[in-house]
A protein has these predicted regions:
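Binuclear metal-dependent hydrolase catalytic cores
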Residues: 1-176
Length: 177
């Protein structure tokens, strides 16, 4: 089996059409002009499935592609259009039988993620499966080569406005946002 990449969304940070926009693209009936925010899911040839970014559209992206299980999540950067679907990981955590779903991000994003979602990361009570929060475990990404869950990556930084974001190469595929 080869790797399989599913594009869950290829739109801008607002998605397409944009609310209140009356341009030709946003008014178009062409299904190619109806795009959710950017994310992919990769099913590797060694039977691992990983998600790149959790957009605010994540629930519909997963449902419309019949995705019920992932092994880990990669975050490319800390913008809202790449993070704010994080709560929709809850049902995917159920298959981990009380264990935390690993998510990977650059070390400089760890505090930002934890501060943006304190209800997930600042739990003081015992973790309860299905207790209203996703059970997630932060794992650092190291630039260069790294093996995650038997999946080999080469991670690198890219310019994205005034910040740097994470890109990666896996097998014969590269992901550049």
């Amino acid at each position: 089996m080869n790797n399989k990449v599913t594009f869950l969304g290829t739109g801008t940070s607002t998605g397409v059409p944009v609310i209140g926009c009356h341009c030709q693209v946003c008014k178009s009936e062409n299904p190619h002009n109806k795009r959710l925010r950017t994310s992919i899911i990769v099913q590797t040839k060694n039977n691992k499935t990983f998600l790149v970014d959790t957009t605010p559209d994540l629930r519909m992206q997963l449902l419309s592609n019949s995705i019920e299980k992932i092994d880990f999540v990669l975050f490319t950067h800390e913008h809202a259009d790449h993070l704010h679907g994080i709560d929709d990981l809850r049902p995917l955590c159920f298959s981990f039988n009380g264990k935390e779903l690993p998510f990977y991000a650059l070390p400089e994003y760890e505090n930002s993620l934890k501060n943006k979602f304190p209800y997930i990361f600042n739990r003081t009570k015992k973790k309860i499966l299905g207790g209203g929060v996703p059970l997630l475990k932060y794992c650092p990404i190291i630039l260069g080569e790294q093996i995650i869950e038997d999946v080999k990556f080469n991670f690198f930084l890219l310019p994205h406005g005034r910040m740097k974001v994470l890109g990666f190469q896996h097998d014969k595929m590269a992901y550049i946002i």
